[in-house]
Amino acid sequence: MSIATATFAFSLFATIAFAVPPETPRIELQAERGLGDKSYAPWQVDCPSNVTWIRNATTGLGSGERAYIEAREKLVQPVIEQMMAARGLETPPRTPNIGVALSGGGYRAMLTGLGGIMGMMNESTEASESETGGWLDGVSYWAGLSGGSWATGTFMSNGGQLPTNLLENLWNIDSNLVFPDDDKLSFYTELYTETNAKSDLGFPIQITDVWGLAIGSHVLPERYQLSNTPNLTFSSLPSVVSALGNASLPMPIIIAADRKRREAGELVIAENATVWEFTPYEFGSWAFGSQYKSPGAFTPIEYLGTSVDDGSPNGTCWKGFDQLSFVMGTSATLFNGAFLELNGTDSGLLTNLITAFLADLGEDQADISRIPNTFSNYNSGENPIYNLTYITLVDAGETNQNIPLEPLLVPTRDVDAIVAFDSSYDTDYIWPNGTALRTTYERAKVLAEHENTRVLMPEVPSMNGFVNGGYNSRPTFFGCNDTTTPLIIYVPSYPWSFAANTSTYQLSYENDEANEMLLNGMRSLTLNHSVPTWPTCFACALTDRSFMYTSENRSTTCQKCFDTWCWAGDDNTTEPATYEPVINSVPPWLVANNLSIGVADAPASNESTAGTASSGAAKADVSMGMVALAAGLGLML
């Protein structure tokens, strides 16, 4: 990094890390900026008289979401009929409500998750030949978290293009996410200009603003990237993306979690923390609180940032706070997790330097995302956040719920089936072990204590049970005969053709590597076209709830599928051996059950360690980047 760039980086990040926002936005500069609709910063508008500023979660779906899902259902129904007919299966008596959920895990999760999505797209020749392509057109909801939120943002904002096309024609993920290869001073100048404009209006800024703008400049449409007009809001997506305007894509949901501070000053991200969701229509939560849960509420996301007291605006209204890049950055605020990454570094000097930097950020709350609290003084008798100025949000994966299942488990949404793509870093070799599902199951038991806050999560095994049963190496159906919950089709990342166990903190990918990640993610869903019965069984699982099937009345074909792919309720809690799958191999369970054909034998050596080597390199890359960032902040040992 050049001296000039480092100096400017210092100015930028020092401003962000140590700025203290005023209690309410300043508006004296607004006249100079006009509407500001080409800027990252929010802009002032007249307060509308026909807006419901706070909607209690117990009232069901918001009007915008309800209208979208109704329009979506009309498009989904003929797709379901066509896909079922192609498998020789009966058309369900009602249209199933299907969701997909993409886990967190940085670029690894974005690429692997979008690969899984590609496995459901007819536009992919390989997915079409594997006979799972086409099902995405039958999906109503799409939820993303952290790296999965990047997948959500790039896919939705680009109108649902094939991910390999986005890689070839748009993404520049071969350039480091925070420290671009070209090292242009303009990158930092633009970051400073955009974030400073937001700060000048009195809104809180933090590293999340910079993080989000950087993400957007790598994966959002070029016209909305930092060097052009970084002003794409979440609420504007249905009006600027025709495929969302006419409900041709699933409705997107991005989630984050709140962070609390204990009396002793310890920063806490609890597994039972409030889960917040962003949609093109609303921001809010279905359940407020951590230790005690009460019914949550929602506010129109278009006016997020407006100061509201007990359901009424305080005279000044704002638009533009819901920048899509900011929402994506909020869902992927990984800085707390960086502490975990430091434990494996070899340099004590490096560790001390970055730890000091992160500790300062944590103390000043610059490593979280601050949202002006629209729910201030609302329902103060039951609302645990009624007296907060800001809602403080972090990466929801830090609750260990690294798959955004909860929004799709809410009874009001009536979701029938969820395809859950898991790219979590759970094991020593950066593969999933079911922690995300198990954590959500345990959380669901707490939420079920109150009727108005419950979510409908089927039972799943322990983490040891996932590994010992091989459930973390191939798709598994959960909740097969529990018709009170959605059926979950769990799709873990597995090295079918590539060592996809790269580090969460790998901030750049060469295009060839990214392409292999996408293809491997697709094959984790299609099973590399190696199991002839899989497309039929996948169809059975997606539509089962709409038939109200159980083992007593399910069709012979689908029951045979469920006998094969459903979790049988076993849970071997014995400590498993180290999980280290072999690249280019078939999951042992598929071989043992004589399900797979036409796949080459695994190589003699375990090449998945290449992924570990890649993770080590990634760790070095991000460490050097953090050193430069810390140096820019002028931190000294």
Curated annotation (Swiss-Prot):
Return the PROSITE patterns for the record: PLA2C (PS51210)
PLA2c domain location, by residue? 46-572
* Annotated localization: Secreted; Cell membrane
**Any one of the GO CC terms:** plasma membrane
Q: How is its activity regulated?
A: Inhibited by Fe(3+) ion.
Q: Which residues are glycosylated?
A: 50, 56, 122, 231, 246, 272, 314, 343, 387, 433, 481, 501, 528, 553, 572, 594, 606
Matching entries from PANTHER family are given as: CYTOSOLIC PHOSPHOLIPASE A2, LYSOPHOSPHOLIPASE 1-RELATED
**What is the role of the protein in this entry?**
Exhibits phospholipase B (PLB), lysophospholipase (LPL) and lysophospholipase/transacylase (LPTA) activities.
Name of the molecule in the record: Phospholipase B
Can you name the source organism? Cryptococcus neoformans var. grubii serotype A (strain H99 / ATCC 208821 / CBS 10515 / FGSC 9487)
